[in-house]
Amino acid sequence: MPVPQTPARMPRKLLRDQIFDTLLDAIVSGDLVAGEPISDKQLETWLGASRTPIREAVNRLAGMGLIEVLPQRGTRIAPLDPIRFAEEMEMLGVVYSAAVREAVALLTDADRARIAELHATVSRTREALERARIVDALMSVFIDRYRNTLIQRIRERSVPHVTRMITARPGALDATDTSAALDALASAAAAGDADAAAHAVSAYFTAGVASVMARDAAETAAMTVTEDESA
């Protein structure tokens, strides 16, 4: 048939991608908690979609390590893994610091204004999930300007794990432990100092790992003491 003359109404996203985004947000925010079992039927009822696009989204999330598909045992939200969190943070620190070093010289006036705006916002934000999302947006200004597709893919796979851990343990990533690094990053970007900006990014992720792991160790020690006292 001839090509129609009237504009076609194309969906902005495929249904499976919409479902993926909804599930990803629910996992990262903690609405779907670590270890929680989920079934296709539950998801069909909640999302109002058929099994095929739901299963495609679930398999994609399983490939990212956010969902576990257990043979003969069903599907569940992946447990929190402090070791993986530390590894993801360490990798992001290395990759981002290298990208930021190259990106600083490429920043536009609009980029620098956006960095300053996000820095001001994160400085007065204490809620864990919101703060993590603002920091991600701030880092993304540099990453987007650098335009390296491999780094973009690393970000898409790693940031959800990091944000999820931070959200699940409010206070674990103490804002005071990372604020100095973010202050230094904003100042370096404004001054066009690539080396200082890269160092600030590395310092942010190093401080973040130390903060969360220290909190995790303290909680583990407290649980051990409680168990010993109960024995």
Positions of predicted regions on the chain:
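All-alpha effector-binding/dimerization core of bacterial HTH-type transcriptional repressors
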Residues: 78-146, 157, 174-200
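Secondary-structure boundary/capping motif
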Residues: 16, 54-58, 119, 145, ...
